[in-house]
Amino acid sequence: MSTQLDNITSAETAPDYLDEVPDDVEMSLFDHLDELRTRIFLSLGAVLVGVVACFIFVKPLVQWLQVPAGTVKFLQLSPGEFFFVSVKVAGYSGILVMSPFILYQIIQFVLPGLTRRERRLLGPVVLGSSVLFFAGLGFAYYALIPAALKFFVSYGADVVEQLWSIDKYFEFVLLLMFSTGLAFQIPIIQVVLGFLGIVSSEQMLKGWRFVILGAMVLGAILTPSTDPLTQSLLAGAVLGLYFGGIGCVRLLGK
């Protein structure tokens, strides 16, 4: 009888298997800093390679990004303006192309400190984050940018001729695309917060009024244009993602 009680007690006091950190190795602060420095240098080197590679093929990228503007003509208003635009496009594209490698370096740095339970969430979070980011880029390219440009062109069509600075155009397009990609990460943040038990799905749902206000503010901040149509489209997408994130958290039972 006493042996059975001892077994029950030991089973209750044993650490949960999912909460264990596998292959836990003690490292000093300097070891962590050295590894962080190595990961950063590898990521920066990869970005540099990606930027150079994208710069070689930058003209097709520029032409592809000009498609939403339709028949609008672009001007180079200063010497070297198109060159610096090309560098900017290559920079954004290089980071995007090398983002899987950068993400891999981040995972390798944080992985040793994660429990088995947390590692089970890592794969779906990384995959979902990547899919949502590229979905955000596509939403901006195919929906937000054409809507904003159509508004601007039609608003002044009978007053001014549409001749745009190529630098200002690409600043608008690149900023809108990447800010939309970041805004599409909202469900991932919700899932992580729900999984960690910081916020429940009920708490997320109770604050829907503040979420609507926050979505409108976020749409105004993230869109470089000031037209209400683009801001409303982005705000609507943010709201849809937020309530979709609540559904995902509920599926986790949180």
UniProtKB/Swiss-Prot annotation:
The keyword Thylakoid does not apply. It is found in: Cell inner membrane. It is a multi-pass membrane protein. One of its GO terms (cellular component) is TAT protein transport complex. The keyword Cell membrane applies. It comes from the Bacteria. Keywords: Cell inner membrane, Cell membrane, Membrane, Protein transport, Translocation, Transmembrane, Transmembrane helix, Transport. One of its GO terms (molecular function) is proton motive force dependent protein transmembrane transporter activity. Forms a complex with TatA. Part of the twin-arginine translocation (Tat) system that transports large folded proteins containing a characteristic twin-arginine motif in their signal peptide across membranes. Belongs to the TatC family. This is Sec-independent protein translocase protein TatC.
